[in-house]
Protein backbone atom coordinates (compact mmCIF):
# COMPACT_ATOMS: atom_id res chain seq x y z
CA UNK A 1 0.00 0.00 0.00
CA UNK A 2 1.21 3.54 -0.80
CA UNK A 3 0.89 5.88 2.19
CA UNK A 4 1.30 9.68 2.00
CA UNK A 5 2.09 11.50 5.26
CA UNK A 6 2.06 15.28 5.68
CA UNK A 7 4.04 16.41 8.72
CA UNK A 8 5.66 19.69 7.70
CA UNK A 9 8.39 19.79 10.35
CA UNK A 10 11.60 18.00 11.32
CA UNK A 11 12.01 14.26 11.73
CA UNK A 12 14.07 14.30 14.90
CA UNK A 13 13.82 15.84 18.34
CA UNK A 14 10.65 15.34 20.35
CA UNK A 15 6.89 14.96 20.13
CA UNK A 16 5.28 14.90 16.70
CA UNK A 17 8.68 14.70 14.99
CA UNK A 18 9.40 11.40 16.71
CA UNK A 19 5.84 10.21 16.06
CA UNK A 20 6.16 10.65 12.32
CA UNK A 21 9.67 9.20 12.12
CA UNK A 22 8.63 6.13 14.08
CA UNK A 23 5.37 5.76 12.16
CA UNK A 24 7.12 5.95 8.79
CA UNK A 25 9.74 3.44 9.90
CA UNK A 26 7.02 1.04 11.10
CA UNK A 27 5.06 1.38 7.85
CA UNK A 28 8.21 0.57 5.88
CA UNK A 29 8.85 -2.45 8.11
CA UNK A 30 5.31 -3.65 7.39
CA UNK A 31 6.04 -3.52 3.66
CA UNK A 32 4.25 -0.30 2.73
CA UNK A 33 5.60 2.42 0.41
CA UNK A 34 5.79 5.76 2.27
CA UNK A 35 5.81 9.30 0.89
CA UNK A 36 6.57 11.73 3.73
CA UNK A 37 6.33 15.52 3.37
CA UNK A 38 8.44 17.32 5.96
CA UNK A 39 10.95 20.17 6.38
CA UNK A 40 13.94 18.16 7.59
CA UNK A 41 16.89 19.07 5.38
CA UNK A 42 18.80 16.09 6.75
CA UNK A 43 16.03 13.56 6.11
CA UNK A 44 18.28 11.57 3.80
CA UNK A 45 20.51 10.65 6.74
CA UNK A 46 17.75 8.54 8.32
CA UNK A 47 18.12 4.82 7.76
CA UNK A 48 14.60 4.26 6.42
CA UNK A 49 14.60 7.19 3.95
CA UNK A 50 15.71 5.92 0.54
CA UNK A 51 15.07 9.04 -1.57
CA UNK A 52 14.60 12.79 -1.09
CA UNK A 53 12.41 15.05 -3.19
CA UNK A 54 13.02 18.81 -3.48
CA UNK A 55 11.70 21.63 -5.61
CA UNK A 56 14.95 23.36 -6.52
CA UNK A 57 14.28 25.71 -9.42
CA UNK A 58 10.55 25.14 -9.05
CA UNK A 59 10.43 21.58 -10.41
CA UNK A 60 10.20 18.43 -8.30
CA UNK A 61 13.41 16.41 -8.36
CA UNK A 62 13.77 13.09 -6.54
CA UNK A 63 17.29 11.95 -5.66
CA UNK A 64 17.53 8.23 -4.93
CA UNK A 65 19.87 7.25 -2.10
CA UNK A 66 19.39 3.48 -2.34
CA UNK A 67 17.23 0.89 -4.05
CA UNK A 68 14.62 -0.32 -3.53
CA UNK A 69 12.97 2.97 -2.57
CA UNK A 70 10.67 2.24 0.36
CA UNK A 71 10.33 5.76 1.76
CA UNK A 72 10.72 9.10 0.00
CA UNK A 73 10.94 12.31 2.02
CA UNK A 74 9.81 15.50 0.26
CA UNK A 75 10.64 19.08 1.29
CA UNK A 76 7.92 21.44 -0.02
CA UNK A 77 9.26 24.87 -1.08
CA UNK A 78 7.82 26.99 1.74
CA UNK A 79 10.64 29.56 1.81
CA UNK A 80 12.44 30.74 4.93
CA UNK A 81 9.45 31.17 7.27
CA UNK A 82 8.44 28.08 9.24
CA UNK A 83 5.12 28.47 11.09
CA UNK A 84 5.25 26.88 14.55
CA UNK A 85 2.99 26.48 17.57
CA UNK A 86 5.41 27.53 20.31
CA UNK A 87 8.13 30.14 19.80
CA UNK A 88 11.49 28.48 19.30
CA UNK A 89 14.58 28.54 17.09
CA UNK A 90 14.94 26.24 14.07
CA UNK A 91 18.20 26.06 12.17
CA UNK A 92 17.83 27.39 8.64
CA UNK A 93 14.40 28.94 9.21
CA UNK A 94 12.78 32.04 10.60
CA UNK A 95 10.31 30.42 12.98
CA UNK A 96 7.10 32.32 13.64
CA UNK A 97 4.05 31.18 15.55
CA UNK A 98 0.92 30.79 13.45
CA UNK A 99 -0.83 33.76 15.13
CA UNK A 100 2.15 35.95 14.22
CA UNK A 101 1.79 35.22 10.49
CA UNK A 102 0.14 37.78 8.25
CA UNK A 103 -2.80 36.56 6.19
CA UNK A 104 -0.59 36.66 3.10
CA UNK A 105 2.15 34.59 4.77
CA UNK A 106 -0.37 31.99 5.91
CA UNK A 107 -1.90 31.81 2.43
CA UNK A 108 1.53 31.32 0.83
CA UNK A 109 2.40 28.58 3.30
CA UNK A 110 -0.84 26.71 2.65
CA UNK A 111 -0.55 27.09 -1.11
CA UNK A 112 3.06 25.86 -1.22
CA UNK A 113 2.27 22.76 0.81
CA UNK A 114 -1.01 21.97 -0.94
CA UNK A 115 0.74 22.31 -4.30
CA UNK A 116 3.48 19.93 -3.18
CA UNK A 117 0.91 17.39 -1.95
CA UNK A 118 -0.97 17.65 -5.25
CA UNK A 119 2.17 17.05 -7.29
CA UNK A 120 3.33 14.11 -5.17
CA UNK A 121 -0.15 12.55 -5.24
CA UNK A 122 -0.32 12.88 -9.03
CA UNK A 123 3.07 11.22 -9.28
CA UNK A 124 2.71 8.28 -6.86
CA UNK A 125 -1.08 7.72 -6.58
CA UNK A 126 -1.25 7.05 -2.81
CA UNK A 127 -3.89 4.68 -1.44
CA UNK A 128 -4.29 6.49 1.89
CA UNK A 129 -2.88 9.58 3.60
CA UNK A 130 -2.32 11.05 7.06
CA UNK A 131 -2.36 14.71 8.09
CA UNK A 132 -0.64 15.78 11.29
CA UNK A 133 -1.58 18.76 13.48
CA UNK A 134 -4.99 20.42 13.58
CA UNK A 135 -3.36 23.43 11.89
CA UNK A 136 -2.55 23.19 9.09
CA UNK A 137 -1.93 19.63 7.89
CA UNK A 138 -5.58 18.59 7.46
CA UNK A 139 -6.42 21.66 5.36
CA UNK A 140 -3.29 21.08 3.28
CA UNK A 141 -4.40 17.52 2.47
CA UNK A 142 -7.99 18.59 1.83
CA UNK A 143 -6.79 21.12 -0.74
CA UNK A 144 -3.93 19.08 -2.17
CA UNK A 145 -5.76 15.77 -2.51
CA UNK A 146 -9.08 17.23 -3.62
CA UNK A 147 -11.09 14.26 -2.37
CA UNK A 148 -9.14 11.72 -4.43
CA UNK A 149 -7.42 9.95 -1.52
CA UNK A 150 -8.94 8.95 1.84
CA UNK A 151 -7.06 10.42 4.80
CA UNK A 152 -6.89 10.39 8.57
CA UNK A 153 -5.90 13.23 10.90
CA UNK A 154 -3.58 12.87 13.90
CA UNK A 155 -4.17 15.51 16.55
CA UNK A 156 -1.09 16.66 18.46
CA UNK A 157 -1.66 18.88 21.48
CA UNK A 158 0.27 22.03 20.57
CA UNK A 159 -1.71 23.12 17.50
CA UNK A 160 -4.98 22.60 19.34
CA UNK A 161 -4.07 24.27 22.62
CA UNK A 162 -1.65 27.00 21.54
CA UNK A 163 -3.20 28.06 18.23
CA UNK A 164 -6.81 27.07 17.61
CA UNK A 165 -8.19 27.32 21.14
CA UNK A 166 -6.91 30.86 21.89
CA UNK A 167 -7.39 32.11 18.31
CA UNK A 168 -10.65 30.52 17.20
CA UNK A 169 -11.77 33.56 15.27
CA UNK A 170 -8.89 33.13 12.87
CA UNK A 171 -8.11 29.40 12.77
CA UNK A 172 -11.33 27.51 13.57
CA UNK A 173 -12.66 27.48 10.01
CA UNK A 174 -9.30 26.32 8.65
CA UNK A 175 -9.35 23.45 11.14
CA UNK A 176 -12.93 22.55 10.20
CA UNK A 177 -12.02 22.53 6.53
CA UNK A 178 -9.33 19.94 7.18
CA UNK A 179 -11.35 17.70 9.49
CA UNK A 180 -14.43 17.64 7.26
CA UNK A 181 -13.01 15.15 4.77
CA UNK A 182 -11.14 12.90 7.20
CA UNK A 183 -12.17 9.26 7.45
CA UNK A 184 -11.03 9.18 11.06
CA UNK A 185 -9.52 11.56 13.62
CA UNK A 186 -6.90 10.11 15.97
CA UNK A 187 -6.16 11.49 19.43
CA UNK A 188 -3.59 10.34 21.95
CA UNK A 189 -5.93 10.39 24.93
CA UNK A 190 -9.47 10.97 26.14
CA UNK A 191 -8.35 14.36 27.43
CA UNK A 192 -7.25 15.48 23.96
CA UNK A 193 -10.45 14.16 22.43
CA UNK A 194 -12.62 16.14 24.83
CA UNK A 195 -10.55 19.27 24.26
CA UNK A 196 -10.87 18.84 20.50
CA UNK A 197 -14.64 18.33 20.65
CA UNK A 198 -15.08 21.41 22.82
CA UNK A 199 -13.03 23.67 20.56
CA UNK A 200 -14.43 22.39 17.26
CA UNK A 201 -18.07 22.44 18.48
CA UNK A 202 -19.06 19.80 15.92
CA UNK A 203 -21.63 17.28 17.24
CA UNK A 204 -20.65 14.72 14.58
CA UNK A 205 -16.92 14.78 15.36
CA UNK A 206 -16.91 12.42 18.40
CA UNK A 207 -18.29 9.59 16.25
CA UNK A 208 -15.23 9.85 13.97
CA UNK A 209 -12.70 10.19 16.79
CA UNK A 210 -10.61 7.23 17.91
CA UNK A 211 -7.64 6.65 20.19
CA UNK A 212 -4.37 6.65 18.28
CA UNK A 213 -1.55 7.24 20.77
CA UNK A 214 2.11 7.08 19.79
CA UNK A 215 4.01 3.87 20.36
CA UNK A 216 7.38 2.70 21.56
CA UNK A 217 10.05 0.76 19.70
CA UNK A 218 10.02 -2.26 21.98
CA UNK A 219 13.10 -3.68 20.29
CA UNK A 220 15.26 -0.65 21.17
CA UNK A 221 13.73 0.67 24.41
CA UNK A 222 14.39 -2.04 26.99
CA UNK A 223 16.09 -2.42 30.37
CA UNK A 224 19.82 -3.06 30.62
CA UNK A 225 21.90 -4.28 33.57
CA UNK A 226 23.73 -1.38 35.23
CA UNK A 227 27.10 -2.37 33.79
CA UNK A 228 25.73 -2.61 30.25
CA UNK A 229 23.79 0.65 30.70
CA UNK A 230 27.04 2.33 31.69
CA UNK A 231 28.87 0.93 28.68
CA UNK A 232 26.14 2.11 26.30
CA UNK A 233 26.10 5.54 27.94
CA UNK A 234 29.84 5.90 27.49
CA UNK A 235 29.57 4.70 23.89
CA UNK A 236 26.94 7.40 23.28
CA UNK A 237 29.28 9.98 24.81
CA UNK A 238 32.01 8.76 22.48
CA UNK A 239 29.79 9.15 19.42
CA UNK A 240 28.91 12.69 20.46
CA UNK A 241 32.53 13.65 21.08
CA UNK A 242 33.72 15.78 18.21
CA UNK A 243 30.29 15.76 16.57
CA UNK A 244 28.49 19.00 15.77
CA UNK A 245 26.42 18.85 18.95
CA UNK A 246 26.50 22.62 19.37
CA UNK A 247 24.19 23.02 16.37
CA UNK A 248 20.41 23.22 16.51
CA UNK A 249 19.46 22.55 20.14
CA UNK A 250 22.70 20.80 21.03
CA UNK A 251 25.39 21.73 23.54
CA UNK A 252 29.15 21.56 23.12
CA UNK A 253 29.57 19.76 26.45
CA UNK A 254 27.06 16.97 25.79
CA UNK A 255 29.73 14.27 25.58
CA UNK A 256 31.38 15.31 28.84
CA UNK A 257 28.01 15.58 30.58
CA UNK A 258 27.12 11.99 29.69
CA UNK A 259 30.58 10.60 30.37
CA UNK A 260 30.34 12.04 33.87
CA UNK A 261 27.39 9.77 34.72
CA UNK A 262 27.93 6.33 36.26
CA UNK A 263 24.76 4.23 36.54
CA UNK A 264 26.80 1.40 38.04
CA UNK A 265 27.43 3.33 41.25
CA UNK A 266 24.95 6.23 41.42
CA UNK A 267 21.17 6.56 40.99
CA UNK A 268 20.37 8.80 38.01
CA UNK A 269 17.15 10.77 37.58
CA UNK A 270 16.42 12.42 34.25
CA UNK A 271 14.17 14.74 32.31
CA UNK A 272 13.83 14.44 28.52
CA UNK A 273 11.89 17.01 26.51
CA UNK A 274 11.60 20.62 25.43
CA UNK A 275 12.98 23.25 27.80
CA UNK A 276 10.02 25.61 27.82
CA UNK A 277 7.97 26.95 30.73
CA UNK A 278 4.97 24.68 30.16
CA UNK A 279 7.07 21.54 30.68
CA UNK A 280 7.45 22.31 34.40
CA UNK A 281 11.18 21.60 34.69
CA UNK A 282 11.37 24.37 37.30
CA UNK A 283 9.40 22.10 39.65
CA UNK A 284 11.92 19.28 39.27
CA UNK A 285 14.84 21.63 39.90
CA UNK A 286 13.17 23.04 43.02
CA UNK A 287 12.49 19.50 44.27
CA UNK A 288 16.05 18.32 43.73
CA UNK A 289 17.61 19.66 46.97
CA UNK A 290 14.94 17.74 48.91
CA UNK A 291 15.91 14.57 47.04
CA UNK A 292 19.64 15.16 47.41
CA UNK A 293 19.26 15.66 51.15
CA UNK A 294 17.93 12.09 51.45
CA UNK A 295 19.91 10.46 48.62
CA UNK A 296 23.21 12.40 48.36
CA UNK A 297 24.59 10.12 45.65
CA UNK A 298 21.71 10.82 43.25
CA UNK A 299 22.43 12.66 40.00
CA UNK A 300 20.09 14.77 37.85
CA UNK A 301 20.44 15.10 34.07
CA UNK A 302 18.33 17.43 31.90
CA UNK A 303 18.08 16.39 28.24
CA UNK A 304 16.54 18.79 25.73
CA UNK A 305 16.61 22.26 24.26
CA UNK A 306 14.41 25.31 24.21
CA UNK A 307 14.05 28.98 24.96
CA UNK A 308 13.89 28.43 28.73
CA UNK A 309 17.19 26.58 29.00
CA UNK A 310 19.27 29.51 30.26
CA UNK A 311 16.63 30.48 32.80
CA UNK A 312 16.55 26.93 34.17
CA UNK A 313 20.33 27.01 34.59
CA UNK A 314 19.99 30.37 36.33
CA UNK A 315 17.30 28.95 38.63
CA UNK A 316 19.52 26.01 39.59
CA UNK A 317 22.42 28.39 40.23
CA UNK A 318 20.25 30.64 42.41
CA UNK A 319 18.88 27.73 44.44
CA UNK A 320 22.36 26.28 44.89
CA UNK A 321 23.65 29.63 46.13
CA UNK A 322 20.77 30.02 48.59
CA UNK A 323 19.58 33.04 46.62
CA UNK A 324 15.87 32.40 47.01
CA UNK A 325 15.09 36.02 46.11
CA UNK A 326 16.39 35.48 42.57
CA UNK A 327 14.53 32.17 42.39
CA UNK A 328 11.37 33.97 43.46
CA UNK A 329 11.93 36.64 40.80
CA UNK A 330 12.20 33.90 38.16
CA UNK A 331 8.93 32.44 39.43
CA UNK A 332 7.27 35.85 39.31
CA UNK A 333 8.29 36.60 35.72
CA UNK A 334 7.44 33.15 34.39
CA UNK A 335 6.91 32.93 30.64
CA UNK A 336 8.34 36.43 30.17
CA UNK A 337 11.82 34.89 30.43
CA UNK A 338 11.22 32.75 27.33
CA UNK A 339 9.80 35.62 25.31
CA UNK A 340 6.14 35.41 26.30
CA UNK A 341 3.92 37.62 28.45
CA UNK A 342 4.68 37.94 32.18
CA UNK A 343 2.85 35.41 34.32
CA UNK A 344 3.78 33.84 37.64
CA UNK A 345 4.85 30.22 37.93
CA UNK A 346 2.31 29.68 40.69
CA UNK A 347 3.43 26.22 41.85
CA UNK A 348 7.09 27.22 42.11
CA UNK A 349 6.08 30.46 43.81
CA UNK A 350 3.89 28.59 46.30
CA UNK A 351 6.78 26.33 47.26
CA UNK A 352 9.29 29.16 47.67
CA UNK A 353 6.83 31.30 49.63
CA UNK A 354 6.13 28.38 51.95
CA UNK A 355 9.77 28.02 52.99
CA UNK A 356 10.03 29.57 56.44
CA UNK A 357 12.10 29.20 59.58
CA UNK A 358 13.92 25.90 60.02
CA UNK A 359 12.43 24.46 56.83
CA UNK A 360 13.95 27.32 54.87
CA UNK A 361 17.32 26.83 56.56
CA UNK A 362 17.30 23.09 55.86
CA UNK A 363 16.39 23.67 52.22
CA UNK A 364 19.13 26.26 51.69
CA UNK A 365 21.65 23.95 53.35
CA UNK A 366 20.61 20.99 51.17
CA UNK A 367 20.60 23.09 48.00
CA UNK A 368 24.18 24.20 48.59
CA UNK A 369 25.48 20.80 47.51
CA UNK A 370 22.59 19.55 45.41
CA UNK A 371 23.43 20.90 41.98
CA UNK A 372 27.09 20.03 41.67
CA UNK A 373 26.09 16.89 39.81
CA UNK A 374 23.43 18.53 37.62
CA UNK A 375 24.13 18.13 33.90
CA UNK A 376 22.46 19.68 30.84
CA UNK A 377 23.09 17.73 27.64
CA UNK A 378 21.14 19.82 25.14
CA UNK A 379 19.19 18.10 22.39
CA UNK A 380 19.87 14.45 21.74
CA UNK A 381 18.50 12.56 18.76
CA UNK A 382 15.57 10.30 19.54
CA UNK A 383 17.71 7.43 18.29
CA UNK A 384 20.16 8.16 21.13
CA UNK A 385 17.57 7.63 23.87
CA UNK A 386 17.71 3.79 23.94
CA UNK A 387 21.35 4.21 24.99
CA UNK A 388 20.47 6.84 27.61
CA UNK A 389 17.21 5.85 29.30
CA UNK A 390 18.35 2.45 30.67
CA UNK A 391 20.81 4.38 32.86
CA UNK A 392 17.93 6.23 34.57
CA UNK A 393 16.27 4.89 37.70
CA UNK A 394 13.54 7.50 37.24
CA UNK A 395 12.38 9.94 34.61
CA UNK A 396 10.22 12.90 35.61
CA UNK A 397 7.55 14.34 33.30
CA UNK A 398 6.48 17.48 35.19
CA UNK A 399 4.43 19.27 32.51
CA UNK A 400 2.05 21.89 33.84
CA UNK A 401 0.28 22.23 30.46
CA UNK A 402 -2.02 19.53 29.03
CA UNK A 403 -0.24 16.80 27.09
CA UNK A 404 -1.97 14.74 24.41
CA UNK A 405 0.02 11.63 25.35
CA UNK A 406 2.91 10.67 27.60
CA UNK A 407 5.22 9.05 25.07
CA UNK A 408 8.34 9.91 27.08
CA UNK A 409 6.77 8.17 30.08
CA UNK A 410 6.09 5.03 28.04
CA UNK A 411 9.65 4.96 26.70
CA UNK A 412 11.05 5.45 30.20
CA UNK A 413 8.91 2.62 31.56
CA UNK A 414 9.98 0.37 28.68
CA UNK A 415 13.58 0.91 29.81
CA UNK A 416 12.75 0.18 33.44
CA UNK A 417 12.81 3.77 34.72
CA UNK A 418 10.07 5.00 37.04
CA UNK A 419 7.89 7.32 34.90
CA UNK A 420 6.94 10.00 37.44
CA UNK A 421 4.37 12.16 35.63
CA UNK A 422 2.04 15.01 36.46
CA UNK A 423 -1.44 13.61 37.04
CA UNK A 424 -3.41 15.31 34.29
CA UNK A 425 -4.43 15.02 30.64
CA UNK A 426 -2.80 12.31 28.53
CA UNK A 427 -0.06 11.83 31.12
CA UNK A 428 -2.60 10.59 33.67
CA UNK A 429 -4.11 8.21 31.14
CA UNK A 430 -0.71 6.63 30.49
CA UNK A 431 -0.06 6.35 34.22
CA UNK A 432 -3.37 4.54 34.69
CA UNK A 433 -2.31 1.92 32.13
CA UNK A 434 1.05 1.35 33.87
CA UNK A 435 -0.02 1.34 37.54
CA UNK A 436 -1.50 -2.20 37.51
CA UNK A 437 1.97 -3.58 36.76
CA UNK A 438 3.40 -2.71 40.19
CA UNK A 439 2.52 -3.43 43.80
CA UNK A 440 0.03 -1.20 45.59
CA UNK A 441 2.67 0.66 47.60
CA UNK A 442 4.65 1.55 44.47
CA UNK A 443 1.77 2.62 42.20
CA UNK A 444 1.30 6.08 43.83
CA UNK A 445 4.94 6.90 43.07
CA UNK A 446 4.15 7.10 39.35
CA UNK A 447 2.34 10.44 39.57
CA UNK A 448 2.02 13.74 41.40
CA UNK A 449 -0.75 16.31 41.55
CA UNK A 450 -0.35 19.51 39.57
CA UNK A 451 -0.79 22.15 42.25
CA UNK A 452 0.87 24.13 45.06
CA UNK A 453 2.31 20.96 46.60
CA UNK A 454 3.87 19.66 43.38
CA UNK A 455 7.50 20.31 44.37
CA UNK A 456 7.22 18.45 47.66
CA UNK A 457 5.34 15.54 46.06
CA UNK A 458 7.93 15.12 43.30
CA UNK A 459 10.63 15.02 45.97
CA UNK A 460 8.71 12.55 48.17
CA UNK A 461 8.04 10.16 45.31
CA UNK A 462 11.60 10.22 44.02
CA UNK A 463 13.02 9.76 47.52
CA UNK A 464 10.66 6.85 48.22
CA UNK A 465 11.52 5.17 44.90
CA UNK A 466 15.27 5.58 45.31
CA UNK A 467 14.98 4.36 48.89
CA UNK A 468 13.20 1.11 48.06
CA UNK A 469 15.12 -2.10 48.75
CA UNK A 470 16.99 -2.98 45.57
CA UNK A 471 15.12 -6.23 44.96
CA UNK A 472 11.70 -4.54 45.20
CA UNK A 473 12.76 -1.70 42.94
CA UNK A 474 14.21 -4.11 40.36
CA UNK A 475 11.00 -6.15 40.36
CA UNK A 476 8.97 -3.00 39.79
CA UNK A 477 11.28 -1.86 37.00
CA UNK A 478 10.92 -5.20 35.21
CA UNK A 479 7.14 -5.11 35.59
CA UNK A 480 6.87 -1.56 34.22
CA UNK A 481 8.97 -2.52 31.23
CA UNK A 482 6.92 -5.61 30.46
CA UNK A 483 3.64 -3.68 30.79
CA UNK A 484 4.70 -0.91 28.41
CA UNK A 485 5.94 -3.44 25.87
CA UNK A 486 2.61 -5.29 26.01
CA UNK A 487 0.45 -2.20 25.52
CA UNK A 488 2.41 -0.06 23.06
CA UNK A 489 4.08 -0.93 19.77
CA UNK A 490 4.54 1.04 16.53
CA UNK A 491 3.33 -1.71 14.22
CA UNK A 492 -0.12 -1.53 15.83
CA UNK A 493 -0.07 2.27 15.61
CA UNK A 494 0.70 2.08 11.88
CA UNK A 495 -2.13 -0.35 11.22
CA UNK A 496 -4.51 1.91 13.14
CA UNK A 497 -3.55 4.91 11.00
CA UNK A 498 -4.37 3.02 7.80
CA UNK A 499 -7.69 1.82 9.22
CA UNK A 500 -8.63 5.36 10.30
CA UNK A 501 -7.81 6.78 6.87
CA UNK A 502 -10.03 4.17 5.25
CA UNK A 503 -12.85 4.94 7.68
CA UNK A 504 -12.68 1.45 9.24
CA UNK A 505 -13.29 2.75 12.75
CA UNK A 506 -15.17 -0.16 14.27
CA UNK A 507 -11.97 -1.95 15.30
CA UNK A 508 -10.27 1.12 16.81
CA UNK A 509 -10.67 2.04 20.50
CA UNK A 510 -12.89 4.97 21.37
CA UNK A 511 -11.70 7.64 23.80
CA UNK A 512 -13.71 6.71 26.86
CA UNK A 513 -13.57 8.18 30.39
What are the residue ranges of the model-derived segments?
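A charged, aromatic-enriched C-terminal amphipathic alpha-helix characteristic of glycosyltransferases
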Residues: 15, 452-457, 467-501
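Short hydrophobic beta-strand element within catalytic cores of glycosyltransferases
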Residues: 418-421, 426-432
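Membrane-proximal helix-turn-helix segments that form the acceptor-binding/catalytic region
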Residues: 168-185
Amino acid sequence: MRVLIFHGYLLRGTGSNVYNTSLARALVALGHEVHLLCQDRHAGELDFVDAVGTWKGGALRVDVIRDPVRCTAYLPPIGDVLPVYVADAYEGFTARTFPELSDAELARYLAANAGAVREVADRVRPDVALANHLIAGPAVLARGLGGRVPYAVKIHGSALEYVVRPHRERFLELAREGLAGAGGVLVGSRHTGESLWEVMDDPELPARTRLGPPGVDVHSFRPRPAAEAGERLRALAGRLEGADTAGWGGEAGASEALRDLSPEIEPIVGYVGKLIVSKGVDLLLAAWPLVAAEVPSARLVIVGFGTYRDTLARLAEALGAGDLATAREIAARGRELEGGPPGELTYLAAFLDGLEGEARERYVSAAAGAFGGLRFTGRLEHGDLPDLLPSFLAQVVPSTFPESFGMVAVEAAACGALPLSASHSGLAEVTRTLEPAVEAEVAPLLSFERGPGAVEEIARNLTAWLGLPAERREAARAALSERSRELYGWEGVAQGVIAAAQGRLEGLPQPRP
